[in-house]
């Protein structure tokens, strides 16, 4: 039998974020009692914290189909028209990284979200006319790592807006314990704590580490976390080699650095730096953003000495 990590299929199986789960369940129950379509939901937060999983669980709870599309794939009105043409009554449409949807497509979404209707231009030149088309009622769930890029008219059309942030150590430890048992790994409390410490309080990273431990045990017949973390270049607090390189770049400079300079020195695009590297370093107070640029803090310098 092939062993694999099984994602939660119900809200009861979802670990952590109980206040958020309760709010979602309340909205679902109210929509069922009122026999109305569940309000559109916007989920925002860092990568890997379960936004897609929550969308899937909502669809499961509604006993309906989940349609998934990336925001970056909605760049023309026809892209959105194709997406909603596949929707059946009561479906859930999940748009991941919804901030990447083209502005003109966002505007097209407004009447669809409001009244499930869309105006389409048919024909060309003098023979063209605007036709209003009905869309099957559905729930739109948007997910984003960059809430600030969601324009206000679009954000205002979401009835439920939830911040899915990092998890507590206790929540990550519980996940690691569950995933370890699913993979037939006999992890002791110290090993579970070590995995948690190296996960950046992010479920996706914790799952990734558990999978690598499973591979290590299959090949080497034993678990060696210290060796595994060294091979994966995952350091104290879960920082990876690119995070350390970022800190080292700032540490070598005597003045604040702009994002373009950092991008050039690291050879990494701005989007990756701002969305993958900086959020956790800011949260851990290892760097600061000032009007003049990014600077390393004393905590960041201490980390470089001790990691």
Swiss-Prot record:
SMART domains: AAA. Residues 168-233 are annotated as: Small ATPAse domain (RuvB-S). GO terms for molecular function: ATP binding; ATP hydrolysis activity; four-way junction DNA binding; four-way junction helicase activity. InterPro entries: AAA+_ATPase (IPR003593), DNA_helicase_Holl-junc_RuvB (IPR004605), P-loop_NTPase (IPR027417), RuvB-like_N (IPR008824), RuvB_C (IPR008823), WH-like_DNA-bd_sf (IPR036388), WH_DNA-bd_sf (IPR036390). It catalyses: ATP + H2O = ADP + phosphate + H(+). The keyword Hydrolase applies. GO terms for cellular component: cytoplasm; Holliday junction resolvase complex. Mg(2+) binds at residue 52. Its EC number is 3.6.4.-. It is found in: Cytoplasm. Keywords: ATP-binding, Cytoplasm, DNA damage, DNA recombination, DNA repair, DNA-binding, Hydrolase, Nucleotide-binding. It holds the Pfam family RuvB_N. Its main location: cytoplasm. ATP binds at residues 5, 48, 51-53, 157, 167, 204. GO terms for biological process: DNA recombination; DNA repair. Residues 1-167 are annotated as: Large ATPase domain (RuvB-L). SUPFAM superfamilies: P-loop containing nucleoside triphosphate hydrolases (SSF52540), Winged helix' DNA-binding domain (SSF46785). DNA binds at residues 270, 289, 294. It comes from the Bacteria. PANTHER family: HOLLIDAY JUNCTION BRANCH MIGRATION COMPLEX SUBUNIT RUVB, PTHR42848. Belongs to the RuvB family. The RuvA-RuvB-RuvC complex processes Holliday junction (HJ) DNA during genetic recombination and DNA repair, while the RuvA-RuvB complex plays an important role in the rescue of blocked DNA replication forks via replication fork reversal (RFR). RuvA specifically binds to HJ cruciform DNA, conferring on it an open structure. The RuvB hexamer acts as an ATP-dependent pump, pulling dsDNA into and through the RuvAB complex. RuvB forms 2 homohexamers on either side of HJ DNA bound by 1 or 2 RuvA tetramers; 4 subunits per hexamer contact DNA at a time. Has 3 domains, the large (RuvB-L) and small ATPase (RuvB-S) domains and the C-terminal head (RuvB-H) domain. The head domain binds DNA, while the ATPase domains jointly bind ATP, ADP or are empty depending on the state of the subunit in the translocation cycle. During a single DNA translocation step the structure of each domain remains the same, but their relative positions change. Homohexamer. Forms an RuvA(8)-RuvB(12)-Holliday junction (HJ) complex. HJ DNA is sandwiched between 2 RuvA tetramers; dsDNA enters through RuvA and exits via RuvB. An RuvB hexamer assembles on each DNA strand where it exits the tetramer. Each RuvB hexamer is contacted by two RuvA subunits (via domain III) on 2 adjacent RuvB subunits; this complex drives branch migration. In the full resolvosome a probable DNA-RuvA(4)-RuvB(12)-RuvC(2) complex forms which resolves the HJ. NCBIfam families: PRK00080.1, ruvB. This is Holliday junction branch migration complex subunit RuvB. It comes from Mycoplasma genitalium (strain ATCC 33530 / DSM 19775 / NCTC 10195 / G37).
């Amino acid at each position: 039998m092939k062993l694999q990590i099984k994602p939660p299929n119900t809200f009861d199986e979802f670990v952590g974020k109980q206040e958020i789960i309760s709010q979602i369940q309340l909205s679902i129950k109210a929509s069922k009692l009122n026999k109305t379509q569940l309000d559109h939901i916007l989920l925002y937060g860092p990568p890997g914290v379960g936004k897609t999983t929550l969308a899937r669980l909502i669809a499961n709870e509604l006993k309906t189909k989940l349609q998934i599309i990336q925001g970056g794939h909605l760049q023309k009105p026809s892209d959105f028209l194709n997406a909603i043409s596949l929707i059946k009554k009561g479906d859930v449409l999940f748009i991941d990284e919804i901030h990447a949807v083209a502005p003109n497509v966002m505007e097209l979404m407004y009447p669809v979200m409001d009244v499930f209707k869309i105006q389409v231009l048919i024909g060309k030149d003098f023979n063209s006319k605007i036709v209003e088309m009905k869309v099957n009622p559905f729930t739109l769930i948007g997910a984003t790592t960059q809430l600030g890029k969601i324009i206000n008219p679009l954000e205002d059309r979401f009835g439920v807006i939830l911040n899915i942030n990092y998890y507590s150590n206790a929540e990550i430890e519980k996940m690691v314990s569950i995933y370890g048992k699913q993979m037939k790994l006999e992890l002791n409390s110290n090993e579970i704590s070590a995995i948690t410490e190296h996960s950046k309080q992010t479920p996706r990273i914790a799952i990734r580490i558990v999978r690598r431990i499973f591979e290590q045990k299959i090949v080497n017949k034993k678990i060696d976390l210290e060796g595994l973390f060294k091979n994966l270049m995952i350091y104290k607090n879960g920082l990876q080699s690119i995070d350390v390189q970022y800190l080292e770049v700032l540490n070598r400079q005597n003045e604040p650095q702009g994002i373009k300079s950092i991008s050039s020195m690291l050879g990494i695009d701005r989007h990756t730096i701002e969305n993958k590297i900086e959020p956790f370093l800011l949260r851990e107070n290892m760097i600061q953003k000032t009007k003049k640029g990014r600077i390393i803090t004393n905590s960041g310098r201490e980390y470089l000495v001790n990691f």
